[in-house]
A protein has these predicted regions:
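Short, glycine-biased loop/turn motifs at secondary-structure junctions and
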Residues: 1-107
């Protein structure tokens, strides 16, 4: 299975745990893949606006277009209206999008 979508980063393209990401690279994680705060895997969303749910007050948010593959765990939060969120074993950072592109995609 392959999933395309988005992932949020801080202004230095680090995730909330301090791991740095770069364009055109593949990242992989070991262990069982499970979505959630106690889970394991790289989190991503198919809807760009859903990535903002996971941002911790970054001054300058960077959004990456990503491809997730390998083992994948899908999660839908029907109570809060968030759908198609994933934890993936392997994550490819296709590119980082500009703030202008991000706004256009969300309108």
């Amino acid at each position: 299975m392959v999933v395309t979508g988005f992932k949020a980063f801080d202004s230095k393209t680090n995730n909330r745990y301090g791991m740095h990401f770069e364009e055109k690279k593949v990242y992989s994680v070991d262990g069982n893949i499970k979505f959630g705060t106690c889970g394991n895997g790289y989190h991503m969303c198919t809807n760009l606006e859903d990535t903002l749910r996971y941002v911790d007050n970054y001054d300058n948010i960077v959004i990456g277009e990503v491809i997730g593959f390998g083992d994948i765990d899908q999660y839908d939060d029907e109570y809060n209206g968030y759908y198609d969120m994933y934890a993936v074993r392997k994550l490819y950072i296709r590119r980082f999008i500009s703030r202008e592109e991000m706004i256009k995609m969300m309108l």
